[in-house]
Regions:
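Small-side-chain secondary-structure face that scaffolds active or pore-lining regions
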Residues: 80-92, 109, 115-119, 175-177, ...
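Residues embedded in well-ordered regular secondary structure
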Residues: 1-82, 119-122, 164-168, 185-187
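Outer-membrane beta-barrel channels and translocator barrels
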Residues: 52, 63-64, 98-102, 187-189, ...
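Flexible hinge/switch segments at interdomain interfaces of large molecular machines
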Residues: 32-36, 155, 159, 216-218
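Outer-membrane beta-barrel proteins
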Residues: 39-56, 75-122, 157-177, 227-239
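A surface-exposed, glycine/aromatic-enriched loop/edge motif typical of exported proteins
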Residues: 1-23, 111-153, 209
Length: 257
């Protein structure tokens, strides 16, 4: 904090364009905070220690003619920013049936994901905050305004990005995908092989963003009817494909055709 204040003084922040009472008062207010021991490390405020969790259950069985496999998996991935995370639940069911020279395979997979963005804002906001600023007020509450450089021709109000965590806001994305793959293999002879595959997938998703009127984004909006917003976007996609292949392999002495 002391180094930051000294750098501002040496750069002429409080003397550029001539000394004034406002500039001197502003400098004294920063000096008092430094002498009081304020030395906030802003870079760790929005960060969290993230531990990823994975859980899976697999069940397989069958005989030579019919085989099956069931799978359920859950993956929880917290983000580096506080209160950000992504949860993915996956389930799949696979069948394989062999009848003489024909092999049938079918696989169905379901994916459901929920992602929450952090209400703590972007990390770059915290890199611009000076260590002599107090994030909390006298009663321990998170302050909305941190600083005022209006006296030296700067911003009239520096907002605290932590303030947006004191109320309910939302930035959440949900996506659901179903995929099916059906495959047929036919071997009329040992040398001849035909394969056909059909795949189909459909995904739907939406994103909800809600920011109430007290959000710092609307601090400069004077019309109260324009403060706060809610946005919802939706997406849907369907994809399919067909693959047909044939192959013939024949060994003639030491050569393959």
């Amino acid at each position: 904090a002391r180094e930051t204040r000294d750098a501002e003084l040496k750069s002429g922040l409080y003397t550029y364009g001539g000394e004034t009472v406002e500039k001197w008062q502003l400098y004294q207010s920063k000096l008092r905070e430094v002498l009081a021991g304020v030395n906030t490390y802003w870079l760790d405020k929005p960060l969290q220690t993230a531990f990823q969790q994975r859980h899976t259950v697999t069940l397989e069985g069958g005989d030579e003619a019919l085989r099956y496999r069931m799978y359920v998996g859950y993956n929880s991935s917290p983000g580096v920013m506080k209160d950000s995370k992504r949860d993915v639940l996956t389930g799949s069911l696979d069948f394989q049936y062999r009848l003489k020279k024909v092999l049938l395979k079918n696989s169905i997979t379901l994916d459901n994901s929920v992602a929450n963005e952090s209400p703590w804002g972007s990390f770059s906001e915290y890199t611009r905050l000076n260590p002599y600023l107090r994030p909390y007020g006298e009663n321990g509450e998170i302050q909305k305004r941190l600083d005022n450089f209006e006296g030296v021709g700067g911003e009239s109000s520096y907002l605290n990005p932590m303030y947006n965590t004191t109320f309910n806001s939302k930035d959440q994305s949900k996506n659901f995908t179903v995929r099916e793959l059906f495959k047929v293999e036919y071997n009329p002879t040992n040398e001849l092989r035909f394969e056909g595959a059909f795949n189909l997938s459909k995904s739907v998703g939406h994103r909800d963003i809600f920011r109430p009127a007290q959000h710092t984004l609307f601090d400069n909006v004077t019309d109260p009817t324009l403060r706060g917003d809610y946005r919802r976007s939706q997406s849907e996609a369907v994809n399919w494909g067909i693959d047909l292949t044939g192959s013939w392999n024949k060994q003639l002495e030491d050569h393959y055709l």
